[in-house]
Amino acid sequence: MTSAVTRKAEPGLRRAHIAIATVFAVHGSVTGNFATRIPWIKDQLDLSAGQLGLALVFPAIGASLAMPLAGRIMHRFGSRAALRGLLALWCAALATPAAAPGLVWLCGLLFVYGATSGMADVAMNALGVDVEQRKGKSIMSGLHGMWSAGTLAGSAIGVAAAHGGVDARLHLAVAAAVLVPLGYLACAGAPDIHPELEAEAPPRFALPPRSALVIGAIGFCAVFAEGASMDWCAVYLRDVTGASAGVAAASYTAFACTMAATRLAGDAVVRRLGPVRTVRAGGLLAVVGGLLVVAADAQPLAITGFALLGVGIAVVVPLCFAAAGHAGPVPSQAIAGVATVTYTSGLVAPAAIGVIANASSLTASFGLVTLLAAGLVVGAGVLRPAAGRAVSAPSGG
């Protein structure tokens, strides 16, 4: 991380890698379990679409405001204890939204849910970057692949619970009760980084370094495309190509599965091509996918387009976090800056797609997604490793 740290009883790199990968999977599983029960919460509280949309803004607000605190917490308590506590809070928060008695309570609980998610997100990415740097080869794509796999596993459990008519309050409480100790045990193998006594604590709130904001702009393009595709692909298939509900749902499955598979395989590609060439190639694939979506007059073409979008953007955010680890004297602060920008993109994307669709068409909305994917091709150079940084990839990328 930085020169002003010492590691106490640091575990072997293999053990640390497995531990952080498990943490990513647990974090993703929380997301997957919750996402599948949103319709239950909507029906239970008799919310309109607008009220639900308002409530679902609060996790992103909570995450964006809390993320800058993660670095200070890690400095105060050490990386392993901070990750263990933040992940436990995030897992425990899973049980709370379904218990909300009304809209105001739901907004407040989702704010806390998002805040704990964001801080845990920064902590686990900071430690993932630390392990990657010490191993001297790319692992961040695989870690985010484990997050995607955890999301798919959590969503499968949630779908089974919903299909079986299980009350979401019971389902999410049981899921939280399982995930809290699982996450706690996983953190036992995480790196334990303690600041030296003379090391200055990072400020509670501070702007990240400019280089982190530039890296965040690349992440913004990728997460905008991801958020737009995840939230709107099924609607696009139904409204534009006339797909049935089942076929429309398949477009989401194609997108999510290709993203997960690409992330799990992405480290090998990064090691061979380097981060710049990998993101440029992915950006080109995403542009092709976006053009297929925009031009689609048949369901297979649109589904193929969304799948290519998933492949193209899959490794961008992991590589942005890896680059942020070198973007300033306090890696956790730079990572928090990148994470905040990407969370903002995830918040803006679904609404922006809806606004453009209302003013013009869904096809025009995904024209914007295609333009942002092209931005990955143009801006990938900001991810080039700094001079002297140890990488296991070609120096040109």
Regions found by a protein language model. Name each.
Residues D46, G78, A99-V104, G242, ...:
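Helix-breaking motifs and short loop linkers at transmembrane-helix boundaries and internal kinks
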Residues G118-R134, A314-P329:
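Intracellular juxtamembrane helix-capping segments at the cytosolic ends
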